[in-house]
């Protein structure tokens, strides 16, 4: 089976074509600047051969048409026609409370995705554009929707409810949803294998640390708490997001700076985090460099980030009553030894000890804890595309079996 995985953003369309026989990508591509001038498509084949083309991409549909051309290109492509693709898996950020698992796309699923536009106005609409384009260009090919929020729907009510008037939840769905669920689920599964234990018997803290960061407490393979909330703004400090702050800061700053609700939202989402504190960058590599040359605000930004992650790890050790493993994943979690060290230093009293030399290894699956560490510390590269492809394959094959078992 070949599965096309699509992640449609507001001005981008990422894709991978994965051969599920050996779970390897045949092609990885990206359409950039969709709906903007100077748009481009790049595609890298399994053998390293690369296509790069500047082409007008006014809509997601046109972008997907270019993806079809790239995948079937006589020189750079990997298939002869789109009929070789057995299924399509789409990443959708928000599934609300309706979806606890991935779902085969139909009219009801489309309606539910649209119902969540208010909850994820920056993400669900472009996600839906990608789905609609795919339905037009590849009619008859089954599509599976994999929701970022689904994995966290196992949280108990006392973990996901806010102490606000209950009717705000009933009327508007105001509660914690959590995000990065596909990544948290994938690395928790890998961690269980590294522990050599059935996932049902594990307690794992997963740290997805990138420009957007979230942490999850995973017990028996199920999310029981996570740091992001109603939106991806809650939780730890991030690249450009402030993370959790005293809510009273919002009206105070609005009054003092004469900001609208939209402007203060932009301030907290786009101008805060380590960028806002440092005044330099949201790229942690730039901050590391600046801090090493004595920039105090860069150092402060890194310390705020590391402390916020450390604090949540401590919370989740209490929530889980201990842990078998702590996992670091995503761009920063996988590649920044210095950030991992900042986060874990001072946790030795909780049985968390890392090997300095192993911690220097970047971007590969490894146990970086010492032999006497009572809690294992793993670095596990995430693979959300493969996770989406696996879910897609499973759902499509299950649906096919069900159809065969129904008498005509």
From Swiss-Prot:
It is found in: Cytoplasm. Mg(2+). Can also accept Mn(2+). Its EC number is 2.7.2.1. Pathway: Metabolic intermediate biosynthesis; acetyl-CoA biosynthesis; acetyl-CoA from acetate: step 1/2. Belongs to the acetokinase family. The keyword Nuclease does not apply. ATP binds at residues 14, 208-212, 283-285, 331-335. Mg(2+) binds at residues 7, 384. One of its GO terms (cellular component) is cytoplasm. NCBIfam families: ackA. This is Acetate kinase. InterPro entries: Ac/propionate_kinase (IPR004372), Aliphatic_acid_kin_short-chain (IPR000890), Aliphatic_acid_kinase_CS (IPR023865), ATPase_NBD (IPR043129). It holds the Pfam family Acetate_kinase. Keywords: ATP-binding, Cytoplasm, Kinase, Magnesium, Metal-binding, Nucleotide-binding, Transferase. Gene3D superfamilies: 3.30.420.40. It is an enzyme of class 2 (transferase). It catalyses: acetate + ATP = acetyl phosphate + ADP. Its cofactor is Mg(2+); Mn(2+). The lineage of its organism: Archaea, Methanobacteriati, Methanobacteriota, Stenosarchaea group, Methanomicrobia. Homodimer. One of its GO terms (biological process) is acetyl-CoA biosynthetic process. GO terms for molecular function: acetate kinase activity; ATP binding; magnesium ion binding. It comes from Methanosarcina barkeri (strain Fusaro / DSM 804). Catalyzes the formation of acetyl phosphate from acetate and ATP. Can also catalyze the reverse reaction. The active site is at residue 148. Substrate binds at residue 91. PANTHER family: ACETATE KINASE, ACETATE KINASE-RELATED.
């Amino acid at each position: 089976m070949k599965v096309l995985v699509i992640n449609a953003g507001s001005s981008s369309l990422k894709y991978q074509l994965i051969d599920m026989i050996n779970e390897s990508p045949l092609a990885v591509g990206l359409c950039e600047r969709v709906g903007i001038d100077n748009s481009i498509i790049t595609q890298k084949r399994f053998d390293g051969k690369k296509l790069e083309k500047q082409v007008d991409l006014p809509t997601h549909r046109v972008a997907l048409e270019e993806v079809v051309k790239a995948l079937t290109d006589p020189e750079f492509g990997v298939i002869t026609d789109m009929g070789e693709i057995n299924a399509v898996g789409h990443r959708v950020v928000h599934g609300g409370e309706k979806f606890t698992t991935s779902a085969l796309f139909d009219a009801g699923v489309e309606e539910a995705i649209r119902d969540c536009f208010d909850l994820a106005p920056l993400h669900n609409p472009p996600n839906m554009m990608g789905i609609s384009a795919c339905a037009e260009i590849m009619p008859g090919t089954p599509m599976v929707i994999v929701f970022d929020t689904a994995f966290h729907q196992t949280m108990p009510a006392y973990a996901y409810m806010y102490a606000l008037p209950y009717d705000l939840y009933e009327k508007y769905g105001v509660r914690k949803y959590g995000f990065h669920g596909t990544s948290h689920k994938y690395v928790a599964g890998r961690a269980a294998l590294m522990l050599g234990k059935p996932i049902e018997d594990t307690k794992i803290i997963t740290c997805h640390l990138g420009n957007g960061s979230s942490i999850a407490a995973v017990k028996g393979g199920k999310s029981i708490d996570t740091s992001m909330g109603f939106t991806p703004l809650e939780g730890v400090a991030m690249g450009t997001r402030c993370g959790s702050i005293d809510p009273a800061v919002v009206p105070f700053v609005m009054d003092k700076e004469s900001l609208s609700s939209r402007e203060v939202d932009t301030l907290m989402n786009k101008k805060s985090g380590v960028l806002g504190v440092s005044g330099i960058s949201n790229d942690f590599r730039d901050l590391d460099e600046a801090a090493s040359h004595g920039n105090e605000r860069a150092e402060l930004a890194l310390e705020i980030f590391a402390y916020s992650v450390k604090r949540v790890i401590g919370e989740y050790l209490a929530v889980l009553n201990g842990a078998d493993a702590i996992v670091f994943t995503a761009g920063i979690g996988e590649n920044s030894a210095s950030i991992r060290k900042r986060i874990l230093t001072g946790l030795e009293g909780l049985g968390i000890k890392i090997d300095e030399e192993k911690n220097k290894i970047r971007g590969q699956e490894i146990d970086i804890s010492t032999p006497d560490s009572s809690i294992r510390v793993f670095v596990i590269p995430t693979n959300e595309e493969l996770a989406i492809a696996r879910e897609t394959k499973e759902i499509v094959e299950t649906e096919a079996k069900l159809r065969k078992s129904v008498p005509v």
